[in-house]
Swiss-Prot record:
Family in the record: Belongs to the helicase family. AddB/RexB type 2 subfamily.
Upper taxonomic lineage: Bacteria, Bacillati, Bacillota, Bacilli, Lactobacillales
Record's protein name: ATP-dependent helicase/deoxyribonuclease subunit B
PANTHER family in alphabetical order: RECBCD ENZYME SUBUNIT RECC
EC number of the protein: 3.1.-.-
Broadest EC class assigned to this enzyme: hydrolase
Gene (name only): rexB
HAMAP family tied to this protein: AddB_type2 (MF_01453)
Subunit record text: Heterodimer of AddA and RexB.
Source organism (scientific name): Streptococcus gordonii (strain Challis / ATCC 35105 / BCRC 15272 / CH1 / DL1 / V288)
GO BP annotations listed: double-strand break repair via homologous recombination
Cofactor names: Mg(2+)
Listed GO MF terms: 5'-3' exonuclease activity; ATP binding; double-stranded DNA binding; helicase activity; hydrolase activity, acting on acid anhydrides
Additional free-text comment from the UniProt record: Despite having helicase-like domains, this subunit does not have helicase activity.
Matching NCBIfam families: rexB_recomb (TIGR02774)
Amino acid sequence: MKLLYTDIRHSLTKVLVAEAESLVATGKRVFYIAPNSLSFEKERAVLECLKTKASFAITVTRFAQMARYFVLNDVRKGQSLDDIGLGMLIYRTLTELDDGELKVYGRIKKDPQFIQQLMDLYHELQTAQMSFADLEFLEEPEKREDLVKIFTAVATALNKGDFDSSSQIATFAQHILSGDTDEELADLALVIDGFTRFSAEEEYLVGLLHRKGVEIVIGTYASQKAYRAAFRDGNLYQASVDFLRKLAEDYQVKPDYIPYAEAEDAFGRISKVLESRYDFSEPAVEVSETDRSQLQIWATMNQKEELEYVAKSIRQRVHDGVRYKDIRLLFGDVEAYQLQLKTIFDQYQIPYYLGRSESMAQHPLVQFVESLERLKRYNFQLEDLLNLLKTGIYGDLTQEELDHFEQYLRFADIKGAVKLAKDFTANSQGKFDLDRLNHIRRRVMAPLQDFFKSRSQTASGLLAKFTEFVQAARLSDNLTALLQEESHQEQERHEEVWKAFSHVLEQFAQVFADSKVKLDDFLALVLSGMLLSNYRTVPATVDVVKVQSYDLIEPLAAPYVYAIGLTQERFPKIAQNKSLLSDEDRARLNDATDSQAELQIASSENLKKNRYTALSLMNSATKELVLSAPALVNEVEDSMSTYLLELTAAPLSLPIIVKKPQASSDDIGSYRALLSQIIELHQEEIDREWTAEEQTFWAVAVRVLRKKLAAEGISIPQISKELKTESLQPETLHALYPKDQPLRLSASALSEYFKNQYGYFIKYILGLQEEWTIHPDARSHGNFLHRIFEKVLQEDTSRDFDQRLEVAIDETMRETEFESLYNESSESLFTRQLLLDTAKSTGQVLAQSAGIETIGEETVFGNSKEPFLILEDGRAVSVRGKVDRIDRLLADGSLGVVDYKSSETKFSYEKFFNGLNSQLPTYLAAIQELQGQQEGRDLFGAMYLQMTEPIVALKDTKELGDAVKEVAKTMQYKGLFLADKLASLGPVYEKSKVNSLSQEELAVLLAYNEILYKKVAEGILAGHFEVNPYTENGRNIAPYVDQFKAITGFEANRHLGQARQLDKLDLSKFEKRPVGEKLRRAWIEKMREELEK
C-alpha cells in the first residue's frame, strides 16, 4: 500500500493518474476509485490527465460498482431486491405484526416515513459491518425489542421468499474470503482519490484486498505542516490528516508527501494564511492586492439579485472568450435556488446542468397513481377525482367535456362514491344538460367502480384487475398521445417513468407473490415506489455551466467558480441525525461491537468535515473565485457566513463588494436580460443620480434594443397610469339595444353602473356570472324568508299571528325547492334553524300591523306601455323590478313600499345623490304606475325591513329594560316617509326628521332619480365604459367595491386618479356639520341645483 498527500493547489488527480499509469505499465488492471458523488466528474478529469487520453486498463468507478464487476456473473442464491422491493417487504412484514407486538412503533408501523427510516437503518447496518443482533446492545429496552423484532421478521421474510438484498461490496468480500477471486486479484491494483474517511464496509474491503496482495494507492490533500503537527484539533486539514494517520497506523505505511514544483498562486497563499489562523501560528506568506483581486466576496439583497449578478458576470466572461464548461456554480442550498435558477439562466440564455437527480412526483403518471390512491382512501373526494381527470391520461374526455363536468361537480358539490354512483338530478333553472352530464359520469365512473370493487386478494389477482383497469382507462393510448408533440429529451423522461412504473409492479408481484393484499395497500405501495423513483439526468451538451452543491466540490475544479447562498445558516452545513438511532445509541453500538464495525456519528464529524469542505471551496477555482451571501433567503433574513467574514479580517482584508445595478457593458447579459432590466429600472425609484456617462449608456442601450425588438416584431407592454377601454362598435350597440325597443334598466343596474362602469359592462353586457352553487346562499336565504312572510300575510288576519307564522314556516319548509336546499346536510339544517329564528324575530314587527293592510307581494313593475322616461333623442327607457311588499294605510288609503333586507340597510342622501342607493326612490316612482294613483299623492313612504336576529351587547346597557328598547329600535321599518303621514304610523316605523319628506321634497327626489337613470341610459347607449370604481375618501378604494383587478389590471396605488370621486356637501357653507332636518334640506337643495342645470 502506498499513501500519498500533497498541497491543495497541486492536482491530486494528476499525481494519482501518474501512479495508475505506472501500475498499468507493470501489467496491472487499475480501478480508479472515487466517492459516489464525484465518480462521473472524476472520470472526465482522469481522462484529461492520461497521456494517451484513454486506457482500457484503467476503470474509473466507485467501490460498489467495482465490486459489481467481480460478482456480475455470480449465480446468486436469491432473487435480487432493490430499495423499492425492500420497502415493500418491510411494509408486508410490519402489516403481519400486531400493533400490540410493537410497544414503541406500533401506531406508526404503516407510516411511509417510518418505513423509509427502517430501510435507511437496514442499509446503514450493512455499511457499518453490523448485524441485526448487534441492536441487542441498545439501552432502551422497548425500542431495542421493537427494532430487533422488526429486523428479525424482515430477515425471516427475506429467507422465506428467497430474496437477496445484500450489498455488492458484502458479496465481493465473501468471494475474497473464500478465495474465488484470487486469480483475478493477482493483477488488480486500486487507486483511491477524493476520500477523507471510509465507511466500515469500504474499510473492510480495502483491508481484505491489501491482505490478498493487491497494490493500493490512496491519496488526499494535506500540508506537510498539518501532517507533522502534534495537535490537530481545529486544523483545516484535520479530516484528511486523521484519515492518513489511521491508514498509516493500520497498515504500517509511512505517507509520502508529493511536493508542488510550480510557483505558489494567490489561492495557495490565502490558504496558508487561513491554515495559520486555525493552527495558531504566524503566517509565513503575505497576500498582495493582486492576490486579493482573484477572490471576491459579494453581498446582495436576495437570491434573485444574486443569481442575476452571477448571470451577468458569466455572460461577460463568455463575451471575453471563456467557455461555459470552464465555469462552475455552487449553491449553499440547492432547493432554495433551483426554481429561480431556471428562470434567470433561461432569461440570460445560459446553458447549465444541475447535477442532481429529479423526482418523478410531478409526472402525470405519478399523479394518476396518487389520485387513485387518494380516491380509494378518502372515498372519492371532489379534488382527487378532478386531479385524476386533469392528468390527461385517464379516459377519453375532451377538454370541453371535462370543463362542463367540473363545473357541474362544483355546482352540485358532488363528493363521495354514493353521490357519484347515482344519476345527477340537481339543476338550476335548466342551466345544465343532465343527460349529457350523466353520460360523462358513467364513462368516468365505470372503470373506477369496477376496479374499486376488488377486495383483498392475491397479488397476481390484484395485478390482473389493475391491468384491466388501466386498459379500460386507456392509459397506454393516452400516454402515447402525450408523447406526440414532446421533444426527444421529454420522450426519454416519459420512457423512464414508464420503466419505473413497470418495475414497481414487478417488485410488488415478486415480494407479495401469493400473499393476500388489500387494494388500499396495493395503491399505497405503488405510489410510494413511484415517489422514490428519480429521473436520470445527464448534460445535453459538454459546453454548459455545471451547477452543484458546494459540499460536493473538489479543489481545482474549474477556472472560474461562483459559490452563492453562503449564509451562516447554510455554510457550514450542520449534519443532523434524523434516523431511528440517536448519537448516543450509535456510540454505544460502536463501543459494544467489533472494531471493524462502526456506525457513523454525524455530529462528531461536523467540525473537521466542514473545515475541510470550506478549504476545498476556497481552492475550487484555478483563476477566479466569487463567494456570495444574500441578506434574505426565501424571504427569511440571514447573515453572512463566518467563513466569509474571516476572509475580511487582517491580514487577508478582503473587501465585501455590495452589488448594485450599474450602467455599463458588464451589466448586459442578453437581449432578454437587458429588456428585463430596463423595465425594472423604469419602474423602480433610483436611489442615486445618474452620471452623464450612465445616461448616455442607457439611452444607447434602449435604442439598440428597440431596433432589435422592432426587427423581430416584438412590442413592449406599457405599464400606464391610465387604464383605457375600447368603445362598443355601432353594430354591437344596435344588436344589444335595438332602436325600436325601450332600453331596460333596474335599480341594481343603476347602482352597478355608478359603482364602476366597467362592472356594469362585465355583468350586464358580457353576462359574466359567479360560479353557481347548489348550496343555500344569501339569495336563497332571502327567498326562504320572503316566502314565509308572503304566506303569513296571505293568511286570514283574524287568526292569531303566531299560529299563522308557524303554519307559514311549516308549509315553506315542505316546499320542494327549500326542502332540498335545507335538508342536505347538518350545516344546511343549522342554517335553516338560524333563518327560522330570524323569521320569528322579524315576525314580531309584522304582528304590529294595526292600521295597515298588505295589498301586494312580489309585485313586478315596469311592464306598462308607458316608459319610465324619454331621452332627448326620443329613445324610451323602462325600469323594471319587483317590490317585496305593498302596504295600504287604512286611514286614508295611501300606499307604501317595503323591501326586505338580510342586513342592516339605511337610506343615505349622499349615496342616492351619487347613484349608489336609488332603490327606495325607484319603488316610490313605481307605485305611481298602479291604477288610480296620481303623481305625488297617496304615498306614505318606502322602507326597509331588516330580517336579522337582533343582538344587543348587555355591556352597553345599564339595565334589562334598556336592552329591550335597543332591540325594539333595530326591529323597525326604516326609510323615507311623507311628513304628513307620520301621525298615522305606529311605533314600528322609525320616525326621524332627516327622512321625513314634504310632498314638494318628494317630487324633487323623484325628479332627480329620473336624472340618474337618464345619465346611465345615455352612457350605456354611448357604448363606452370606464374603469372607474368609486372612492369614498379619495385615498383608497373600499374593499366592498368591485375593482375586477384580474380583468382590468386596476391597482389603487397606480390608478386612483381614475376612481370616481363622490359628490359631497360643501361643509364650508355651514357653521357646523348638518344633521337631521338640516341635512335633508341641504341635499334636497343640491338636487334642485342639479335639476336647474
